[in-house]
Swiss-Prot record:
UniProt keyword Nucleotide-binding, yes or no: yes
Sequence positions that bind L-citrulline: 99, 135, 139, 192, 201, 203, 280
Alphabetized UniProt keyword annotations: Amino-acid biosynthesis, Arginine biosynthesis, ATP-binding, Cytoplasm, Ligase, Nucleotide-binding
Record-listed L-aspartate binding positions: 131, 135-136
Pfam families in alphabetical order: Arginosuc_syn_C (PF20979), Arginosuc_synth (PF00764)
Family matches, as CDD domains: ASS
UniProt source species: Burkholderia lata (strain ATCC 17760 / DSM 23089 / LMG 22485 / NCIMB 9086 / R18194 / 383)
GO molecular-function terms, A-Z: argininosuccinate synthase activity; ATP binding; protein homodimerization activity
Enzyme Commission number(s) from the entry: 6.3.4.5
Gene coding for it: argG
Name of the protein: Argininosuccinate synthase
HAMAP family: Arg_succ_synth_type2
Superkingdom of origin organism: Bacteria
Subcellular location, record wording: Cytoplasm
């Protein structure tokens, strides 16, 4: 039997990741009418645009679900988000502005926790709203089978019968109204939004055009910092880490990481911090474009990176950054719990994050405009007296530097000889306009 089912398995339990929106509501009721036994599973990911989670399972029962559960995923989501922060698992940047992989982190948590809940209920068929062109279909496929090797996957949006009957939002709305649910289709936006406590993703529709900019987006986690009528006062904020864990904001300690991140979101959101516009490569190697929000993670990341650069040596930082980019790509591909990802992640958490203790004061202004005002840590290896231009007791003398220059640069002769070889074989063209005019025609 194939893992992916192309038609509805009638008479069997089918779990659906149920958001309460039009698509999953119509799909659930349609499956019920067609003879399946639908079960609804809703992930509480702290979505900033959802204000009544408890009502969602009730609606699922109303639409025909044989069972409905609300799974609180917030603690696990924040734990994985902080792990990504500690390991720098972010590979998508544009001109130094970072996408914090908030959707891939959310999928790792949702895909494992919902399927685990389904397994408890004896539900071994899973459906969700991901389409065949996106990343999520592969992420959910991997995470679902990782948790339940007996899992079968049924997606209404891959079932031609469902598509023929309910292929669009207008058809779904009419279907629900005819069923007596008086479902009012929400106003169509110029883009689609997916969010969790870590961040929000805006993409598709009008945002598919690169002629449409960030200004068409209405932020849900912060302010539209580009608007002249939005008043934003500069604000100083302190962030404290202990052994790699964020523990305090503005001197207020948080025992619950979820509450700390919510407060970080509020602080960063007041300034529009952490918004970015990215062109990225999807898993299938086609490019897509997204506009992202992550005010809290952006705030924590500024402080964390500052401490990393002040505490660790150059080679450690280089490994942290290189491994972080590799890990970010694995996370994006739905491989956050694969052995190669665990190896990279735990290396960073053990050897980089554990030394990160200290406090950073930051002045936030508009958008991603900020300044670091102070950096304190008992673990700093930054010691200005080593390089002071003033007359102070030095850790090394001019004679020491002469010896270092001599020993460190013995290869200059070798380099000069190699450049001559390259010139002789035509790889370099010496001359007045050359980057290396000084080697032209020189003989040994």
């Amino acid at each position: 039997m194939s893992t992916i089912l192309e038609s509805l398995p009638t008479g069997q339990k089918v779990g659906i990741a149920f958001s309460g929106g039009l698509d999953t509501s119509a799909a659930l009721h349609w499956m019920k009418l067609k003879g399946a036994v639908p079960y609804a599973y809703t992930a509480n990911l702290g979505q900033p645009d959802e204000d009544d989670y408890d009502a969602i399972p009730k609606r699922a029962i109303e639409y025909g679900a044989a069972g409905a559960r609300l799974i609180d995923c917030r603690a696990q989501l924040v734990a994985e988000g902080i792990a990504a922060l500690q390991s720098g698992a972010f590979h998508i940047t544009t001109a130094g502005v970072t996408y914090f992989n908030t959707t891939p982190i959310g999928r790792a948590v949702t895909g494992t926790m919902l399927v685990a809940a389904m397994k408890e209920d004896g539900v071994n068929i899973w459906g969700d709203g991901s389409t065949y062109k996106g990343n999520d279909i592969e992420r959910f496929y991997r995470y679902g089978l990782l948790v339940n090797p007996d899992l079968k996957i049924y997606k209404p949006w891959l079932d031609q019968t469902f598509i023929d009957e309910l292929g669009g939002r207008a058809e779904m709305s009419e279907f629900m109204n005819q069923a007596g649910f008086a479902y009012k289709m929400s106003a169509e936006k110029a883009y689609s939004t997916d969010s969790n406590l870590l961040g929000a993703t805006h993409e598709a529709k009008d945002l598919e055009s690169l002629e449409s900019g960030i200004k068409i987006v209405n932020p849900i986690m912060g302010v539209a910092f580009w608007r002249d009528d939005v008043k934003i006062a500069a604000e100083e904020v302190t962030v404290r880490f202990e052994a790699g864990q964020p523990v305090a904001l503005n001197g207020v300690e948080f025992s619950d990481p979820v509450e700390l991140l919510l407060e970080a979101n509020r602080i960063g959101g007041r300034h529009g911090l952490g918004m970015s516009d990215q062109i990225e490569n999807r898993i299938i190697e086609a490019k897509s474009r997204g506009i992202y929000e992550a005010p809290g993670l952006a705030l924590l990341y500024i402080a964390y990176e500052r401490l990393v650069t002040g505490i660790h040596n150059e080679d450690t930082i280089e490994q942290y950054r290189e491994n972080g980019r590799r890990l970010g790509r694995l996370l994006y591909q739905g491989r956050w719990f694969d052995p190669q990802a665990i190896m990279l992640r735990e290396t960073a958490q053990r050897w980089v994050a554990r030394a990160i203790t200290g406090e950073v004061k930051i002045e936030l202004r508009r958008g991603n405009d900020y300044s670091i005002l102070s950096t304190k840590s008992p673990n700093l290896t930054y010691q200005p007296e080593r390089l002071s231009m003033e007359k102070v007791a030095s850790t090394f003398s001019p004679r020491d530097r002469i010896g270092q220059l001599t020993m460190r640069n013995l290869d200059i002769t070798d380099t000069r000889d190699k450049l001559r070889v390259y010139s002789q074989v035509g790889l370099l063209t010496p001359g007045e306009t050359s980057a290396l005019p000084q080697i032209k025609g020189d003989d040994k």
